[in-house]
A protein has these predicted regions:
Chain B
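Alpha/beta-hydrolase-fold enzymes
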Residues: 1-5, 11, 133, 137, ...
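Alpha/beta-hydrolase active-site loop
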Residues: 114-134
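Conserved alpha/beta-hydrolase "nucleophile elbow" surrounding the catalytic nucleophile
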Residues: 140-145, 295
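Short beta-strand/loop motif that positions the catalytic acidic residue
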Residues: 286, 292-294, 298
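Catalytic histidine-centered segment of alpha/beta-hydrolase-like enzymes
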Residues: 320, 324-339
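N-terminal targeting or regulatory segments adjacent to alpha/beta-hydrolase or S9 domains
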Residues: 1-35, 357-359
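Short, surface-exposed "cap/lid" segments of acyl-processing enzymes
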Residues: 35-108
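Short alpha-helix in the alpha/beta-hydrolase fold that links the catalytic acid
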Residues: 276, 288, 302-311
Length: 292, 359
C-alpha cells in the first residue's frame, strides 16, 4: 500500500470548503430572490445580474488552457501554483536579450488576457440568461425553498453554465485566443530565462543552454553506442558487467540497466550468460529482429 | 415558490451542518492509501518501473499468457488499483491472469529530451521483452489505457510478433473528431516553443483537464458530495479519486510536444504518417484480435475518437464496446466496475488457447 499524497500540497477538504463557500453564495442569491417573491411569483430576471457577476469572478480565477500557461509562466495575478518553475528575477528581468522583446510580449499578453476576460463576461451573461429563461419556462422548483429545491436550482444553474461555456470555448476565436495566450506566455518565460542565463554566464555558473547541450551530447553518445554492432554483441553476451548486472533480483531491482533497456531485459530474472548466449543464437537462427 | 426568512435560515443551517460533517470526514480521510494489490518491481529503466502483481491465493486457474498494462504518461496508474472494491487489477488477478503494469515515474530535468520513441521502443519495448524472456514465450497480451492505448497500438504495429491480443481502454485514435475540445485547444500551440520551455508540470495538465468542464469538475461534484451518500467509506473513495485527479506527473518536454504535434495537430496515426525511430507506424499491420472499450460519455477522449480504431486496424477480430460512463468512470464507476473486468477476462479467455498472430 502506498500513500502518494503525503507530500501533496492538495487538500481535498480545502477544495471542498471553497466549493461549498461558492455554493452558499449562490444559495444566498437564490434565497434572497425567493424571499423577495414571498406571496407571489419571484422575479428571477433581477437575479441574473448578481449571478453573472459572481460567475464571471469565478471564471476569471479558474484555469483554462491559455490562462494556465500564462500562470505557469508566472504572470497570473492570482499567482497560481502550476508554474514551470519560479522565474528567478521577477518582471524586471524581462528586458533586453535576443528574440522577441519581452516588454512587447508583456503588452500582448495583457491584451490577450483582456480578450479572455471578455469571453468570461460573455459566458457569465449567457449562463444567467439561460438560467432565467428556463426558470420562467417552468424549471423552478415549486413551493417553499427547501434544501432539495435549492439543490435543484443549483443543478439547473450548473447545466446552464456548462452549456454556455461549451458554446463559447469551442469557437474558433476562443481556441485561437487560448493558443495565443499559451504561446505568448511561453515566449515570455523563455525571454526571462535568456536573461537569467546571461546573468549566470556573467557569474561563471552553468546555464540552461549548456545543460541542454550536455544532455543532447549524452543522448547522441547513447544512440551511437546502441548503434554499434560490437556494443550490441557485447551486451548480448553479458560482457559489460560494470554497466549491467548479470542478473537482477526481482525483489530488489534497483540496479540501473544499461542505456538500452532491450539488452537489460535480456539479463532478466533467470538469465545466465550461457543461457543468454544460447537464446541469442536461437533468435538469430529464427531470424528474429534484433531487439533495439 | 416562496420562502420565509425562517425557512431560508433553516436551509442554511441544514446545509451548514452537512458541510461541517463532510469536512470532518474529508479530514479523517486524508491518510487513505491506494494500490492495495501486492506487487513487486521486476525491471527498471530510467524512471520506468515494471511491476508484476502477485497472484491471489483464491484466484481461478491461471492463464497461459501474461497481460501487460501500459498506462498513460499524463496520469498515474494507481487508478487501476485504487481500492479493493474499485480495482481492475484485482479483478484480473482473481481471474487468474498474470498481470504486469508499467509505471512511468516522474520525468525530471534529465528527461527533457526523452521522446515518444524512447517511451514506446525503449521503455514499453523493454518491459515487453523482459516479460517475454522471463516467461520464455513469444508473445504476450497487451492492454493500453488512454494515451497508453496509443502507445500499445504503435508498439503492436511495429512489433506484431510480440503481441498476441490487444485490449485498449479509452484510447484515442482519431485526434480530430468534431467533439474533441482538447484537440481544438491544442491545435494552435507552438510546440517548438513549448518544448524549449522544458518539462510540463503535472499541475498544468490537471488545470487543462479540469477546464474542459469546469463547473461540473470544480464545483458540482463537491456539492454533490454534500448531498449524496457521505459515509466514511464513500468519502474515502472520493478522496482517493481527488488525489488521483490532482496527481498528474510532470511530462518530458519533447515527448509531450511530440504527442501534441504529431497526434493532436497532425493526426498522424489515422493519416498513416506517424514514424517512430525511422519506422513507419501502420495500424493496418495490426492483425491481432483487438478489444476496444471506450466511454460513451467521455469528455477527454470522445467516443468517436476511439471508435475510429476499427477503420484503421488490419485485424479481422475487432470488438468495440461503448460503456455508458465517462472517462474516469471507466475505472471507478459502478457501471465500469460491473462491465469492464468481465468483458476483458472473457474476451481474453476466449483467445487464450489460440496461437499468436502470424509473423
Amino acid at each position: 500500500m502506498q500513500n502518494p499524497f503525503a507530500a501533496s500540497p492538495l487538500s481535498p477538504d480545502a477544495v471542498f470548503a471553497g466549493a461549498a463557500e461558492r455554493f452558499f453564495e449562490l444559495l444566498k442569491t437564490f434565497g434572497l430572490q425567493a424571499a423577495s417573491g414571498a406571496g407571489g411569483a419571484p422575479e428571477w430576471s433581477s437575479v441574473a445580474g448578481a449571478l453573472a457577476q459572481q460567475f464571471e469572478q469565478w471564471l476569471g480565477a479558474s484555469p483554462a488552457l491559455g490562462a494556465s500557461l500564462a500562470a505557469s509562466a508566472g504572470f497570473s495575478p492570482a499567482g497560481a501554483p502550476w508554474a514551470f518553475g519560479q522565474v528567478p528575477l521577477g518582471m524586471a528581468a524581462a528586458s533586453g536579450g535576443e528574440g522577441e522583446n519581452p516588454w512587447e510580449l508583456l503588452v500582448r499578453l495583457a491584451q490577450l488576457q483582456g480578450q479572455l476576460a471578455g469571453h468570461w463576461s460573455e459566458i457569465a451573461k449567457s449562463s444567467a440568461e439561460k438560467f432565467v429563461t428556463r426558470l420562467r419556462a417552468g424549471g423552478a422548483p415549486v413551493g417553499e425553498l427547501t434544501s432539495e429545491g435549492a439543490l435543484k436550482l443549483y443543478e439547473l444553474w450548473v447545466e446552464c453554465a456548462e452549456e454556455a461555456y461549451a458554446r463559447t470555448v469551442r469557437t474558433e476565436e476562443f481556441c485561437h485566443l487560448q493558443a495565443q495566450l499559451a504561446n505568448t506566455s511561453t515566449a515570455l518565460l523563455l525571454a526571462q530565462r535568456r536573461q537569467a542565463d546571461a546573468l549566470a554566464r556573467a557569474w561563471g555558473l552553468p546555464t540552461r543552454e549548456e545543460a541542454d547541450a550536455l544532455q543532447r551530447q549524452i543522448r547522441e553518445l547513447r544512440d551511437e553506442l546502441a548503434a554499434k554492432p560490437a556494443a550490441k554483441g557485447a551486451a548480448k553476451s553479458g560482457a559489460k558487467p560494470a554497466a549491467q548486472p548479470a542478473a537482477k533480483s526481482a525483489a530488489a531491482p534497483a540496479a540501473e540497466p544499461p542505456a538500452r533497456p532491450a539488452r537489460a531485459a535480456r539479463a532478466g530474472e533467470r538469465s545466465s550468460p550461457k543461457r543468454r548466449a544460447a537464446k541469442s543464437a536461437k533468435r538469430a537462427r529464427r531470424g528474429r529482429r534484433p531487439r533495439a | 415558490m416562496s420562502a420565509t426568512g425562517g425557512e431560508a435560515a433553516g436551509i442554511f443551517l441544514d446545509l451548514g451542518a452537512r458541510v461541517a460533517e463532510t469536512l470532518a470526514r474529508l479530514r479523517e480521510a486524508r491518510g487513505v492509501t491506494v494500490g492495495g494489490s501486492a506487487r513487486r518491481a521486476v525491471w527498471r529503466h530510467g524512471k520506468t518501473t515494471l511491476y508484476r502483481y502477485l497472484p491471489l491465493e483464491q484466484a481461478e486457474r491461471g492463464a497461459e499468457r501474461p497481460l501487460l498494462i501500459c498506462f498513460a504518461l499524463v496520469n498515474r496508474p494507481y487508478i487501476l488499483d485504487l481500492e479493493p472494491e474499485f480495482s481492475l487489477v484485482r479483478r484480473l488477478l482473481e481471474a487468474g491472469l498474470t498481470v504486469y503494469l508499467i509505471d512511468w515515474g516522474d520525468a525530471d530535468d534529465g528527461d527533457r529530451l526523452r521522446d515518444l520513441n524512447d517511451y514506446i521502443e525503449s521503455e514499453l519495448g523493454g518491459c515487453v521483452r523482459h516479460i517475454l524472456d522471463a516467461h520464455g514465450i513469444e508473445a504476450l497480451d497487451l492492454m493500453g489505457v488512454c494515451q497508453g492505448g496509443v502507445f500499445t497500438l504503435c508498439y503492436t504495429a511495429l512489433h506484431p510478433q510480440q503481441v498476441a491480443n490487444l485490449v485498449t481502454l479509452t484510447a484515442p485514435v482519431d485526434f480530430q473528431t468534431p467533439e474533441d475540445l482538447l484537440s481544438k485547444w491544442l491545435r494552435g500551440i507552438d510546440t517548438e516553443l513549448l518544448a524549449r520551455a522544458g518539462n510540463v508540470p503535472g499541475e498544468m495538465l490537471n488545470a487543462i483537464f479540469l477546464s474542459l468542464m469546469p463547473f461540473r469538475l470544480m464545483q458540482q461534484k463537491y456539492v454533490r458530495l454534500l448531498t449524496g451518500r457521505s459515509d466514511r467509506r464513500a468519502v474515502e473513495t472520493f478522496v482517493r479519486m481527488e488525489r488521483w485527479i490532482f496527481d498528474s506527473p510532470p511530462q518530458a518536454a519533447v515527448a509531450f510536444t511530440e504527442f501534441i504535434r504529431w497526434l493532436y495537430q497532425e493526426n498522424r496515426l489515422v493519416r498513416g504518417t506517424l514514424s517512430l525511430g525511422g519506422r513507419h507506424v501502420d495500424l493496418g499491420r495490426i492483425r491481432q484480435p483487438i478489444l476496444n472499450l471506450y466511454a460513451a460519455g467521455d469528455h477527454i477522449v470522445p467516443p468517436a475518437a476511439s471508435a475510429a480504431m476499427g477503420r484503421y486496424v488490419g485485424s479481422s477480430d475487432y470488438t468495440a464496446c461503448a460503456i455508458e460512463t465517462g472517462h474516469i468512470g471507466m475505472y471507478v464507476s459502478r457501471k465500469g466496475r460491473a462491465e469492464i473486468p468481465g468483458r476483458i477476462i472473457s474476451w481474453l479467455r476466449e483467445r487464450q488457447g489460440r496461437r499468436g498472430p502470424a509473423r
